[in-house]
Curated annotation (Swiss-Prot):
Enzyme Commission number(s) from the entry: 2.1.1.63
Alphabetic keyword roster: DNA damage, DNA repair, DNA-binding, Metal-binding, Methyltransferase, Nucleus, Phosphoprotein, Transferase, Zinc
Record's GO cellular component terms: nucleoplasm
Top-rank lineage group of the source organism: Eukaryota
Catalytic activity: a 6-O-methyl-2'-deoxyguanosine in DNA + L-cysteinyl-[protein] = S-methyl-L-cysteinyl-[protein] + a 2'-deoxyguanosine in DNA; a 4-O-methyl-thymidine in DNA + L-cysteinyl-[protein] = a thymidine in DNA + S-methyl-L-cysteinyl-[protein]
Misc. comment: This enzyme catalyzes only one turnover and therefore is not strictly catalytic. According to one definition, an enzyme is a biocatalyst that acts repeatedly and over many reaction cycles.
A biological process from GO: methylation
Lineage: Eukaryota, Metazoa, Chordata, Craniata, Vertebrata
Annotated GO MF terms: DNA binding; metal ion binding; methylated-DNA-[protein]-cysteine S-methyltransferase activity
InterPro entries cross-referenced by the UniProt entry: MethylDNA_cys_MeTrfase_AS, MethylDNA_cys_MeTrfase_DNA-bd, MethylDNA_cys_MeTrfase_DNAb, MethylG_MeTrfase_N, MGMT_N_sf, WH-like_DNA-bd_sf
NCBIfam families per the UniProt record, alphabetical: ogt (TIGR00589)
Binding site for Zn(2+): C5, C24, H29, H89
Similarity remark: Belongs to the MGMT family.
Name of this chain's protein: Methylated-DNA--protein-cysteine methyltransferase
Length: 216
């Protein structure tokens, strides 16, 4: 984080519990799930409009855009392709690391309704043998849901791991119309369209398992 960053925080309700968004005027720093509740696995009514905690005058443009994006994600996903993605200003994206490349490719290419395997994402980031390093990149993701690490699954179709818990990953994929099954990337996206830009180490040599799933 730059010394010049003046941090702002916003909390909103969601079907997954309270979500805290932090960032500065230049972009988002983190999205965190707090007081996580067990998602209802069955069909649910659309959530109520987000309850925002904090003073509106403290909202920077990236925070405003992030709240609008998350609200649309949970309530009306069909409008997502027309929404701008908030800028991201986390230090991880200010380095030319493999992790940064992986997260950028995931954000740019794997859309709502698609899934991608660890091995596919490693190849998209320029190193097809670095599936295990992709797992590490997912654990380092500072802005989950926005950068959709929940869409990264095993090539066998197994769910794989998720920092937010498997119940949350399963709920997010079901919300996007994806149940158990092999990765759909490339193509097959539930929502088409171009998303407008959020993002203005050495990979591990260890392979993934035979089913294409990273072992953490």
């Amino acid at each position: 984080m730059d010394k010049a960053c003046k941090m702002r925080y916003k909390t909103m309700d969601s079907p997954l519990g309270k979500i805290e968004i932090s960032g500065c005027a230049q972009g988002l720093h983190e999205i965190r799930l707090h007081d996580r509740k067990t998602p209802d696995p069955g069909p649910a009514e659309a959530p109520a409009p987000p309850e925002l905690l904090g003073c509106p005058e403290e909202m920077t443009e990236p925070l405003v855009q992030c709240v609008a994006w998350l609200d649309a994600y949970f309530r009306e996903p069909s409008v997502l392709p027309g929404l701008p993605l908030p800028a991201i200003h986390h230090p991880i994206f200010q380095r030319g690391s493999f992790t940064a490349r992986v997260l950028r490719k995931l954000l740019e290419l794997v859309k709502f309704g698609d899934t991608v395997s660890y091995q596919q994402l490693a190849a998209l980031a320029g190193n097809p043998k670095a599936a295990r390093a992709v797992g590490g990149a997912m654990r380092s993701n500072p802005v989950p849901i926005l950068i959709p690490c929940h869409r990264v699954v095993c090539s066998s179709g197994a769910m794989g791991n998720y920092t937010g818990g498997l119940a949350t990953k399963e709920w997010l994929l079901a919300h996007e119309g994806r149940l158990a099954g092999k990765p759909t990337y490339p193509g097959g996206s539930y929502l088409a369209g171009t998303r407008r830009g959020a993002l203005g180490g050495t990979p591990s040599p260890h392979p993934a398992g035979r089913d294409g799933c990273v072992r953490e």
